[in-house]
Each structure stands twice: as structure tokens, then as C-alpha cells.
């Protein structure tokens, strides 16, 4: 059990039978009346964000989230097959369970799979990945002076904005959290 006074961003709690992660919290102590904690919580199964208020000292059950290091092997229909790095056990996970992280998955990439009650609720990718540009408009001499960007398609199918000087075949570093270009590799 976790006291509402101990809630901080990143803490996982269970509310109404679902796992939630605290995004924001504010301890409010009004001049009159009892103190309370105002929180913004993200449902880890659906991704919905809700605001909840708890009395100071109220206890909540902790959500036991299991983090497992796995390696992405291959796609098989709508399933993506991952291998547990400790037991070498293979586990198929649907693309819908992974969500938007699918666009950066590359074969043999190591990821962290988050499980709650044996059910996959999220995939944590590395913060940056190095991918090859497979499709983009050709650069024209003098493009770099303007500092503009153009769309580029990466080897995994993801599309991001890159500087005008990037060419097809170049390997670039991408931030998976913000979908932004970080630099050449």
C-alpha cells in the first residue's frame, strides 16, 4: 500500500482494478479544512489520462509492474515475437499492445517489456535509435543555408523530419520519445 502523501511522478498505483502511473501531483494544504493531494494519472493499459484527488494520508494499492528485458526477433502476421534475455523463451505480442513504439522496432533490438498481472501493458524503447534513411527528397546545393527540414522515411517505416542535407542511405540518430532527428551516426 502507498500513502497518497508518497505519490510522486513515476509511481505506479492500482485504482479500480487498473494500473496507473502518476504523471503530476500537487499537495494542497488549504487554510481551512484537511489537506489533499491532486494528481494526474495515466492508465497504463489504455493510455488515458485522468485527474484524481485523494485525501492526505489515504492509502492506495501499489501496482506491481514487472520489467523484463527482451529482444525483438521478427514480425509474424499481426504478432511481434520477442525473446526473454534470461530464459530465452519466445513470446508473441500484438502490435496493438505495443502501440506507437512499433515504428522504431528493428530486428535484434533490446527493449524493456512492462507487465502487470502477466499482461503486457507497455514497451520501453531505448531513448535513441540509429536507423537508415530509405526514402527522402534529394538535397539541392545551398539547402543548408535556410535551415529547413524535409520528410524522410526510415528503414522501419517511420517518417520523421530531417535537415535538407540528409541523403538516402545515411544512418541517423532519432529520439524515440519525441520522434525528432538528433544527428548523423
Curated annotation (Swiss-Prot):
The keyword Calcium does not apply. GO terms for cellular component: cytoplasm. Pathway: Protein biosynthesis; polypeptide chain elongation. Pfam families: EFP, EFP_N, Elong-fact-P_C. SUPFAM superfamilies: Nucleic acid-binding proteins (SSF50249), Translation proteins SH3-like domain (SSF50104). InterPro entries: Elong-fact-P_C (IPR015365), NA-bd_OB-fold (IPR012340), Rib_uL2_dom2 (IPR014722), Transl_elong_fac_P/YeiP (IPR020599), Transl_elong_KOW-like (IPR013185), Transl_elong_P/YeiP_cen (IPR001059), Transl_elong_P/YeiP_CS (IPR013852), Transl_elongation_fac_P (IPR011768). It is found in: Cytoplasm. GO terms for biological process: peptide biosynthetic process. It comes from the Bacteria. One of its GO terms (molecular function) is translation elongation factor activity. HAMAP family: EF_P. Involved in peptide bond synthesis. Stimulates efficient translation and peptide-bond synthesis on native or reconstituted 70S ribosomes in vitro. Probably functions indirectly by altering the affinity of the ribosome for aminoacyl-tRNA, thus increasing their reactivity as acceptors for peptidyl transferase. Belongs to the elongation factor P family. This is Elongation factor P. It comes from Synechococcus sp. (strain JA-2-3B'a(2-13)) (Cyanobacteria bacterium Yellowstone B-Prime). The lineage of its organism: Bacteria, Bacillati, Cyanobacteriota, Cyanophyceae, Synechococcales. The gene is efp.
Amino acid at each position: 500500500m502507498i500513502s497518497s502523501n508518497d505519490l510522486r511522478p513515476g509511481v505506479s498505483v492500482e485504482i479500480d482494478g487498473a494500473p496507473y502511473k502518476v504523471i503530476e501531483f500537487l499537495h494542497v494544504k488549504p487554510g481551512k479544512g484537511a489537506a489533499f493531494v491532486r494528481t494526474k494519472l495515466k492508465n497504463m493499459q489504455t493510455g488515458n489520462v485522468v485527474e484524481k484527488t485523494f485525501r492526505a494520508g489515504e492509502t492506495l494499492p501499489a501496482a506491481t509492474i514487472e520489467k523484463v528485458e527482451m529482444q525483438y526477433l521478427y514480425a509474424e502476421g499481426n504478432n511481434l515475437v520477442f525473446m526473454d534475455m534470461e530464459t530465452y523463451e519466445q513470446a508473441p505480442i500484438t502490435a496493438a499492445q505495443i502501440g506507437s513504439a512499433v515504428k522504431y522496432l528493428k530486428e535484434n533490438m533490446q527493449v524493456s517489456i512492462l507487465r502487470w498481472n502477466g499482461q503486457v501493458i507497455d514497451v520501453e524503447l531505448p531513448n535513441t535509435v540509429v536507423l537508415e534513411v530509405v526514402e527522402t527528397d534529394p538535397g539541392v546545393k545551398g539547402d543548408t543555408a535556410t535551415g529547413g527540414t524535409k520528410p524522410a522515411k526510415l528503414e522501419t517505416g517511420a517518417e520523421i523530419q530531417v535537415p535538407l542535407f540528409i541523403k538516402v542511405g545515411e544512418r541517423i540518430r532519432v529520439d524515440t520519445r519525441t520522434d525528432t532527428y538528433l544527428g548523423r551516426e
